[in-house]
Amino acid sequence: MAHKKAGGSTNNGRDSESKRLGVKRFGGESVLAGNIIVRQRGTKFHAGTNVGIGKDHTLFALTEGKVKFAVKGPKNRKFVSIEAE
């Protein structure tokens, strides 16, 4: 005979897979055209010069150069741009 009472069940034990969001190339880093700079939900960062934006708001380089982050405008928005090397 078992000398252990049956353990109760639980409703926990699940979590969603991480989405690996965030900045992939930091300020001053060299990038090639097509390189992903930021993966994000919504426009936490806005596309500046030579930066494209995907349908999921991913920012990517349109030309090669160096990544530059800047805060601009009356709403203090964060912009990402590519400067030619």
Swiss-Prot record:
Any GO BP annotation: translation
Protein's UniProt name: Large ribosomal subunit protein bL27
Molecular-function GO term, any one: structural constituent of ribosome
SUPFAM superfamilies in the cross-refs: Ribosomal L27 protein-like
PANTHER family assigned: LARGE RIBOSOMAL SUBUNIT PROTEIN BL27M (PTHR15893:SF0), RIBOSOMAL PROTEIN L27 (PTHR15893)
Family to which this protein belongs: Belongs to the bacterial ribosomal protein bL27 family.
The encoding gene: rpmA
UniProtKB keywords: Ribonucleoprotein, Ribosomal protein
Cellular component terms (Gene Ontology): cytosolic large ribosomal subunit
Pfam families documented for this protein: Ribosomal_L27 (PF01016)
Region (Disordered) residue spans: 1-22
Endpoints of the signal sequence: none
